């Protein structure tokens, strides 16, 4: 009996040790994932800078002028000088997704979609193309879903409001990173909200990708 009890204790001890070891490995992977997530937000700083410049540009007016005037297009090229979206190292961030909470990933996706949309806006003006290519409605819908309490502000200021809500999205990402590090689990409401945000950010990214593809075909 004593021998059996010793064997059971040894098994329990081994199982507990294995569990602790697995949890430690998982925590380390989550730590790496949140570092990747926030690191990518930092990497997107040049695109955020473009967003800041685009916040003061009236899309329809600027597009109309850029289509007619080469000098206007040159001004926008100067505004974007030094910015190359292809050099932003953000592709690997998808590897972090399984290790961060759904809402942390959703807020990041919304943030990335909005700043990259601003860079597409600039590209359209640099080429002297129609403002119809820039789908501001999808950005509006994305922000209303991600930050529903800001709906009145978004309705009042329209596209000019987009950039000024990025700081709040950054804060939301940081809050969710803290929750991940504290080991908090996502509740049903958070998971459902994350799904809605991701749906809208995916729609925006798909819209931008389709427009860019159309531009490449026309060239």
Show which residues each predicted segment covers.
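Conserved non-transmembrane functional hotspots
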Residues: 1-219
